[in-house]
Amino acid sequence: MAKSQMALCCMSHSPLLNLPGPAQELLDDIEGAIAAAREFVAAFDPDLVVTFSPDHYNGFFYRAMPPFCVGTAAAGVGDYGTYQGPLDVPADLAIDCARAVLDSDVDVAVSAAMDVDHGTVQPLQKLFGDATAKPVIPVFVNSVATPLGPMRRVRALGAAVGTHLAGLGKRVLVIGSGGLSHDPPVPTLATAPPAALDRIVRGVPMTTEQRQARQAAVIEAAREFASGQGALAPLNPDWDRAFLDLLDNGRLAEVDSWDNRWIAEQAGNSAHEVRTWVAAFAALAAQGKYETGNRYYRAAPELIAGFAIRTAVCTS
């Protein structure tokens, strides 16, 4: 079988892209960068998409929180105005991928009924216009629910997935979704009130009123953060740019020594979502050297995020 052709697109996500509040200039600037990435993806025209993405207690909960999970079937939950309904997941290809990862000594769970939120669906909609436009294998990377595993295991996951994908003889796009520096209001085991605790542990569904209240809280938190108020950790553009430089220059192995506490201290608790970028770049790097393009970055307090985009193709 011929070797696969692979390409990559990593991008930040934010529920606030679909909510009132951010200035139109900011939204237009980000949309322009996304449009360029969309053109890159359209020109590549993948046969298969593999997403590495986090979850925000919409599909994975503390009753059983895997570090990694491959979905053999998946559906969007429809949070923050994103698509609700089944994705086009090729079950046989997904289970083969999971088996290959396990054979590579990386422990990964399998879900035959994976619920995915805006972290997975938003980039699919932004890049393809329709979350169901392409067959997709969703790979969950825990980036929120501590304790988290070491970064070297994330890179090992990506490398194992990429090695497997290289042998499929397809045009494969890998997507990493999340980051960069940001510290949005997310409940934790230590601080969550009873209702939120039931949700993040047992997966108790949110009522319509609770979803509306959470959305309003996110909008208010972003407004306060953009005005320099509130208790959220500040963005760290220097850290973000250093991370992007590491990726641009093929120094991915350096993340193996990163300490989880250091990441949170430097860039906020949800900066751990850069794990999805590490996994995606490791998957691409499994084919050889790569070159990045569509290099976009903007510190965006109105989105509570350092917002970045990268595309990449193999050069070897």
Swiss-Prot record:
Gene that this sequence comes from: mhpB
EC class (word): oxidoreductase
Gene Ontology BP terms: 3-phenylpropionate catabolic process
Quaternary structure, from the entry: Homotetramer.
SS bonds (residue pairs): none
Originating organism: Mycolicibacterium vanbaalenii (strain DSM 7251 / JCM 13017 / BCRC 16820 / KCTC 9966 / NRRL B-24157 / PYR-1)
Active site: residue positions: 118 (proton donor), 182 (proton acceptor)
Requisite cofactors: Fe(2+)
Pathway the protein acts in: Aromatic compound metabolism; 3-phenylpropanoate degradation
Function: Catalyzes the non-heme iron(II)-dependent oxidative cleavage of 2,3-dihydroxyphenylpropionic acid and 2,3-dihydroxicinnamic acid into 2-hydroxy-6-ketononadienedioate and 2-hydroxy-6-ketononatrienedioate, respectively.
Protein name stated in the entry: 2,3-dihydroxyphenylpropionate/2,3-dihydroxicinnamic acid 1,2-dioxygenase
EC number: 1.13.11.16
Pfam families: LigB (PF02900)
